[in-house]
A protein has these predicted regions:
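Generic, well-ordered alpha-helical scaffold segments in large soluble proteins
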Residues: 8, 27, 31, 40, ...
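Multi-pass, polyprenyl lipid-linked donor-dependent membrane glycosyltransferases
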Residues: 1-9, 13-32, 46-50, 62-69
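Membrane-interface transmembrane helices that cradle and orient dolichyl/undecaprenyl
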Residues: 33-48, 83
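Transmembrane-lumen/periplasm boundary regions of multi-pass, lipid-linked membrane glycan transferases
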Residues: 58, 71, 77-94, 98-178
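Short hydrophobic alpha-helices at membrane interfaces in multi-pass membrane enzymes
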Residues: 41-57, 96
Length: 178
């Protein structure tokens, strides 16, 4: 509740709330994604795994730059395991492997949501048009490997929704790089 009060009366939030941008939604997605992941770490039940995965997927749908949650989750997981002072090395390793597997499940749930939403958008999008559009727009992208992966994903009907999502991530990365 205290966090909500600070968020609601934050000068940054108040100053930018009149603008229609995705930054406020991204802040909410980042905040909820972090909270639900920490809740999962505290109590790694299947219910918390599901909710953390669902919130992670929604965050990915809110704004492409929230892909930053992936390294954040890895960092939080490592810190969580390393700060368990009552565990020896082999116990920490076991806890890490168990939580890492469940964290991968969280990612899988989130990306299944992303796949299903982007599947709707690519359903009637001709494959050759998607390929040509992606190739043209990303022709100035610095490194070829991510673009090549994206173009390869477009060629498979099942992975085309992921390709469209990754296309957005690459466009954000390209724009941020200048």
């Amino acid at each position: 509740l205290l966090t909500l009060i600070f968020f609601s009366f934050s000068p940054t939030f108040i100053a930018h709330s009149r603008f229609v941008t995705t930054d406020l939604g991204a802040a909410l997605g980042f905040f909820l994604g972090t909270i639900f992941f920490l809740k999962f770490l505290e109590n790694p039940t299947w219910k918390n795994i599901f909710w953390a995965g669902l919130i992670f997927g929604i965050a990915q749908l809110i704004k492409f730059s929230l892909i930053i949650l992936i390294p954040l989750y890895v960092s939080l997981l490592l810190c969580w395991v390393l700060t368990r002072s009552n565990l020896n090395f082999s116990q920490r390793l076991a806890v890490f492997l168990q939580l890492a597997g469940k964290t991968i499940t969280i990612g899988a749930i989130g990306f299944m949501l992303v796949w299903s939403v982007y599947g709707v958008f690519t359903w009637n999008y001709p494959q050759d048009k998607q390929f040509n559009d992606t190739e043209t727009i990303l022709s100035t992208y610095g490194s070829g490997a991510p673009v090549d992966l994206n173009l390869a994903l477009i060629k498979n009907k099942f992975t085309r929704p992921f390709a469209e999502y990754i296309f957005g991530v690459l466009m954000v990365n390209q724009r941020a790089a200048g």
